[in-house]
C-alpha cells in the first residue's frame, strides 16, 4: 500500500474496521489508516459501514455520494457494493452463548465488532483442535501441508451414503477449507433414517450456493444442504422439529411438512411461538420410539435435540413477546433439558467403561467398521483419538447446558412462587447435579 500523507480526511472521518485507527488520505485518494499502512496490510475501512452521525442536510448526503464515486476504483478488499452512507440500526438484542455464560449484545454493533468476533472465533477454532487431541499430530513433519486444516468426515469409495454428515463437514470434504471447519464437529446432524431431510447431496456438493426453497401455500420444505444449513444457522428449529417428529412417527416415510408461518418468523412481534416449539420438543422426546426400555437414543439424535434445546432457550430470552416468562414453559424446557442430560450421561458412561471404542453406539460420529473416519489433513484418526474427540465433544455439550440451567433459576425467581416454582427449582438443581456427575465421571 502506498505511503499516506498525514492529512486528515474530513469527509471520511471514522475508524478502521480492523484496527480502530484514524483515517489518513493517501496520494491515490484511497482511505486508509496509519496502522494498516505501517504493517503493509490491506485496510478494511469501508465508507458505507463507517461509524458516526448521518448527514444532517441532503446536500451533505450528495457530497458523500460524490465522495463514494470518487473512490469507486478502490481495492476490492476495502470497497463495498453500493455507495450508501446510511447507518444500519437494529435494536433487537442477540443472546450469545459461548459455552460459559450468556451475554446480551446489541445487534447494531459496528463492523469493527464483527471483525473482532470473527478473529476471536478463528482463534478459538484453532484452540479447539488441542482439546480434541490434535496437538499430538502437530509435530509430525508430514502434516505440515496446505490442506492440514481440511477437517472433514470422509467415506471410503464404494460405500453407500447410509449416514448423513453435517453440511459443513460434507462441503469441507471436497477440498481445502477454512480453519473454522475445525469447530464443525459440534454441528448436529440427523440419523441415517432421517436422510430424506437432506436428499439433495449432489446439488450441495457441486457448486450450488443460492437457496432454493420449494414454497407452497401451507409449507416450506428444504430442498438442499444449503437450506438445511441456513435453517439451523438462523435458529429456525421449528421446521427441523416438525420434520423429526414426522420421521420418528412414520419411520422416515412420507414427506416432511412444516408450518410456513412458524418457520418464517420465529421472533415476530405479533406472534410468539416459544411455547409451541417447546411443546413440539416435548412431544418428540416423549415419543415411544425414543423412550423404549433397555435402549438408548442415537448419539447424533441426542446432539440434534441438545442443539434444539439450546436454540429454543435462546429464542425465549430474545423474544420480544415473552416479557414475563411462563413457569409452565420453564418446566417444559427443564424436562427436555433433563432428557438430553440423561442421554449425554449415557454416552459419558460408555466412554468411561471403554465399551468397544465407540463401536457400542448404534450410530454417531464414528460408526463401526470405519464407514466414516475423522480426518485431519492426510491423516485418519485412530480409535484412541476418535474416542478423545467424542469425549471432548460430550464435555463441551454438557458445559454448554450449565448457563441454561443458571438462567432458568434466575427466571424462576421472578415468578410468584408456589408449588410449580418450587418444582422447577428442584428440577434445575437435579439437572445441575447430573451435569456435574457426568463431567466428574469423564474426568476419572
Swiss-Prot record:
**Where are stretches of biased composition, namely Polar residues?**
76-87
Q: Where is the composition biased (Basic residues)?
A: 50-59
Q: Which PROSITE patterns match?
A: ZN2_CY6_FUNGAL_1, ZN2_CY6_FUNGAL_2
Q: Which cysteines share a disulfide bond? A: none
Loss of function: phenotype: Abolishes the production of AF-toxins and their precuror 9,10-epoxy-8-hydroxy-9-methyl-decatrienoic acid; and impairs the pathogenicity.
One annotated GO molecular function:
DNA-binding transcription factor activity, RNA polymerase II-specific
In terms of InterPro entries, this protein maps to:
OAF3, Zn2-C6_fun-type_DNA-bd_sf, Zn2Cys6_DnaBD
A single GO cellular-component term from the record reads: nucleus
The feature table lists the DNA-binding region at: 16-43
SUPFAM superfamilies linked? Zn2/Cys6 DNA-binding domain
Per the record, which residues fall in region Disordered?
49-87
Q: Which UniProt keywords apply?
A: DNA-binding, Metal-binding, Nucleus, Transcription, Transcription regulation
Keyword Metal-binding carried by entry:
yes
| Matching Pfam families | Zn_clus
Q: Where in the cell is it found?
A: Nucleus
Q: What else is known?
A: Gene clusters encoding host-selective toxins (HSTs) are localized on conditionally dispensable chromosomes (CDCs), also called supernumerary chromosomes, where they are present in multiple copies. The CDCs are not essential for saprophytic growth but controls host-selective pathogenicity.
What this chain does, per the entry, is described as: Transcription factor that regulates the expression of the gene clusters that mediate the biosynthesis of the host-selective toxins (HSTs) AK-toxins responsible for Japanese pear black spot disease by the Japanese pear pathotype. AK-toxins are esters of 9,10-epoxy 8-hydroxy 9-methyldecatrienoic acid (EDA). On cellular level, AK-toxins affect plasma membrane of susceptible cells and cause a sudden increase in loss of K(+) after a few minutes of toxin treatment.
What is the protein's name according to its record?
Answer: Transcription activator AKTR-1
Native species of this protein?
Alternaria alternata
Q: Give the lineage.
A: Eukaryota, Fungi, Dikarya, Ascomycota, Pezizomycotina
GN (gene name):
AKTR-1
Amino acid at each position: 500500500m502506498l505511503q499516506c500523507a498525514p492529512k486528515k480526511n474530513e469527509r471520511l472521518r471514522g475508524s478502521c474496521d480492523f484496527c480502530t485507527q484514524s483515517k489518513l488520505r493517501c496520494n491515490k485518494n484511497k482511505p486508509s489508516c496509519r496502522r494498516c499502512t505501517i504493517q503493509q496490510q490491506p485496510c478494511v475501512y469501508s465508507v458505507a459501514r463507517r461509524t458516526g452521525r448521518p448527514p444532517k442536510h441532503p446536500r451533505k448526503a450528495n457530497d458523500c455520494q460524490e465522495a463514494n464515486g470518487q473512490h469507486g476504483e478502490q481495492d476490492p478488499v476495502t470497497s463495498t457494493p453500493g455507495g450508501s452512507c446510511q447507518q444500519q440500526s437494529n435494536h433487537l438484542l442477540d443472546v450469545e452463548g459461548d459455552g460459559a455464560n450468556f451475554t446480551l449484545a446489541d445487534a447494531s454493533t459496528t463492523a469493527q465488532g464483527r471483525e473482532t468476533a470473527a478473529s476471536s472465533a478463528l482463534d478459538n477454532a484453532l484452540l479447539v483442535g488441542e482439546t480434541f487431541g490434535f496437538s499430538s499430530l502437530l509435530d509430525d513433519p508430514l502434516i505440515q501441508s496446505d490442506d492440514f486444516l481440511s477437517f472433514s468426515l470422509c467415506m471410503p469409495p464404494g460405500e453407500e451414503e447410509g449416514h448423513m454428515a453435517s453440511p459443513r463437514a460434507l462441503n469441507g470434504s471436497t477440498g481445502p477449507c477454512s480453519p473454522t471447519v475445525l469447530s464443525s464437529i459440534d454441528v448436529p446432524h440427523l440419523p441415517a433414517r432421517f436422510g430424506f431431510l437432506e436428499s439433495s447431496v449432489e446439488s450441495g456438493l457441486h457448486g450450488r450456493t443460492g437457496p432454493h426453497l420449494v414454497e407452497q401455500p401451507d409449507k416450506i420444505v428444504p430442498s438442499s444442504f444449503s437450506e438445511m444449513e441456513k435453517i439451523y444457522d438462523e435458529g429456525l428449529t421449528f421446521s427441523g422439529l416438525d420434520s423429526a417428529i414426522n420421521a420418528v412417527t412414520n419411520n422416515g416415510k412420507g414427506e416432511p411438512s412444516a408450518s410456513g408461518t412458524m418457520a418464517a418468523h420465529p421472533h415476530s412481534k405479533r406472534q410468539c411461538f416459544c411455547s409451541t416449539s417447546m411443546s413440539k420438543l416435548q412431544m418428540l422426546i416423549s415419543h415411544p420410539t425414543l423412550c423404549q426400555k433397555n435402549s438408548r437414543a442415537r448419539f447424533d439424535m441426542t446432539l440434534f435435540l441438545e442443539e434444539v434445546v439450546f436454540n429454543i432457550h435462546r429464542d425465549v430470552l430474545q423474544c420480544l413477546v415473552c416479557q414475563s416468562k411462563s413457569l409452565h414453559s420453564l418446566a417444559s424446557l427443564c424436562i427436555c433439558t433433563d432428557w438430553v442430560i440423561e442421554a449425554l450421561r449415557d454416552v459419558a458412561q460408555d466412554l468411561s467403561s471403554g465399551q468397544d471404542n465407540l463401536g457400542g453406539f448404534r450410530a454417531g460420529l464414528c460408526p463401526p467398521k470405519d464407514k466414516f473416519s475423522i480426518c485431519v489433513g492426510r491423516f485418519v484418526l485412530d480409535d484412541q483419538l476418535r474416542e478423545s474427540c467424542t469425549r471432548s465433544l460430550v464435555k463441551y455439550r454438557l458445559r454448554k447446558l450449565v448457563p441454561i440451567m443458571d438462567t432458568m433459576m434466575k427466571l424462576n425467581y421472578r415468578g410468584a412462587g408456589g408449588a410449580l416454582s418450587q418444582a422447577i427449582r428442584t428440577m434445575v438443581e437435579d439437572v445441575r447435579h447430573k451435569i456435574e456427575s457426568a463431567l466428574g465421571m469423564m474426568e476419572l
